[in-house]
Design a protein with these regions (language model features):
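Gly/Pro-rich active-site loop or hairpin
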Residues: 5-6, 44-52, 74-136, 140
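Active-site acidic/histidine proton-transfer and metal-coordination neighborhood
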Residues: 1-67, 77
Length: 140
């Protein structure tokens, strides 16, 4: 994260209207970050869960135009639901990621549990590339 991004996170439910504001806020120094989504049981109801969706999005927005809040819990759910590699997904989003939203889950429900020792996400959290990225703890 070397672009000095300030962050405003949000869910992409209103993706079309939300993305349209990305062109105006630069004048007011407002930067936009979209939170990655993910659900196992309701996977057909959410946008921006699969790599192909981000490939389409990135045709219109550069890392200077739009940031990504990578929700680790949602990534666990989406990768299970749609059978894709978490590591490849993070690599694809890496230039856009300005924040990591951190919680643990069982891969079926978004439980917002505290992080656990030795789990898959630590290599992402400890990646030097994300040293300056915001870390958001989402525990219940």
């Amino acid at each position: 994260m070397s672009n000095g991004f300030k962050i405003l996170t949000g869910h992409p439910y209103g993706i079309l209207s939300s993305l349209s504001i990305c062109f105006g806020p630069k004048k007011k120094k407002v930067n936009i970050a979209i939170e990655t989504e993910g659900s196992y049981r309701k996977k057909n109801f959410l946008l921006l869960q699969r790599p192909a969706e981000y490939n389409k999005l990135f045709k219109f927005f550069s890392p200077n135009d739009l940031g990504i809040n990578l929700n680790i819990g949602h990534l666990n759910l989406a990768s299970r639901a749609f059978n894709f590699s978490k590591e490849k997904f993070v690599k694809m989003l890496k230039p856009y990621i300005v924040a990591l939203e951190l919680s643990h889950n069982n891969g079926f429900e978004d439980q917002h549990l505290p992080l656990q020792k030795g789990k898959w996400y630590w290599s992402i959290i400890n990646d030097p590339y994300f040293a300056e990225a915001y870390k958001i703890l989402e525990f219940r």
